[in-house]
Amino acid sequence: MRIKSALLTAVLSLLAFSTASAGKHWVATWATAEQVVEPHNCPPAPGLENNSIRQIVQTSISGKVVRVKFSNEFSQGPVTINAAEIAQAATAGASSDIVAGTEVSLTFGGSKSVTIQPGQLVTSDPVKFPMGNRQNVAITMHLGQASSTSVTGHPGSRTDSYLIEGQGSDFSNAVKTAHWYIINAIEIQAEKKARAIVVLGNSITDGRGSTTNEQNRWTDNLSRRLLANKKTKRVSVLNMGLGGNCILQGGLGPTGKSRYPRDLFQQEGVKYIILFEGVNDLGGRGDAISKANQIQDVYKQIIAEAHERGIKVYGAPVMQFKGNNYYSENHEAGRQQLNQWIRSSGYFDGVIDFDAAMGNPDDPAQLNPKYLFENDYLHPNADGYVQMGNCIDLKLFEK
């Protein structure tokens, strides 16, 4: 009888949304790139198993009907969600508080629980959950079986998450950790003109140097500008940056060439792609000229697949790193070669030239000193991320 009841609930849920979905489509309003979480970024005590975690994200564009994706794609064991809720968060991550009366339970095929096998991604049933632009959202999971040493997640959340023992709802004394686990995307049911930008990037896109709980990565600043512009106010921004990521080999997380089919083409409603990778490849061991050529080949493949899907692709030249340990004459020559190709090859539908916008006027091979994060000569600070968000021509996303 329980199985029949769950099936009936699922059918009724689908019927309830069939009218609302007429003439609409799903668009991701928030998403994150995932990997096997490194040991030092794994959940702290009390851990995930048989405990509860509340995670805060800030979405892009508004919606009234949503669904949430949860991922166990990189873990070795199953994850059981006993129950999950979505609610409006009171802050952008500085506290675990939620706005009273906004909690909505999530279901999976009509059931409040779901077990996600290794390698799987699950999507909740659609629910009515009104949220505005740049909405702070809390996703709470009450977990059963779940490893804290082999876990799928996003280490560089730049946002606090909150972990408590047991299956309760009082997070006032929760353990904080600045990582996301298991949550993958939030999608809205939207009118046809709503669409998404997805960015493939590394730690600069992931927001290294931005401020925890302030949501001030360059992609956040771009999103705010898009929302304020009449012709782009229904364009979301999906950040697929991974710290330490390489396109070709090595680095942290799946390589760009292995993850792009999932991180770019499995996102809902994508109309535009921004490719902004390469610095970790060029700055590593080996000949940077050869690497630049190999990166071009990967970019050509991504562009071809995107164009087959009707998606525009914008290239972003690699920013300066003179003064960082990555720098050498060979590495700089590789950067210049790749950047020249991005600007002039004609493969891209447009160029977003962070390199031109962020350079030191007295030494174009170096980041502008006023934009340096901790003088590492690689990552921008919060002001630098504002400059990056501001230098982008919004006309690229108007059609």
Predicted regions and their residues:
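Bacterial N-terminal signal peptides that target proteins for export
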Residues: M1-L8
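N-terminal secretory targeting modules
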Residues: R2, S21-L200, S210-T212, K231, ...
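Bacterial N-terminal signal peptides
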Residues: T9-A16
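Conserved SGNH/GDSL esterase-like catalytic core that processes O-acyl groups on lipids
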Residues: W30, E49-Q55, P78, N82-A94, ...
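Catalytic His-Asp segment of secreted/periplasmic serine-dependent ester chemistry enzymes
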Residues: G283, M319-K399
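Surface-exposed amphipathic alpha-helices with a cationic face
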Residues: Y299-H307
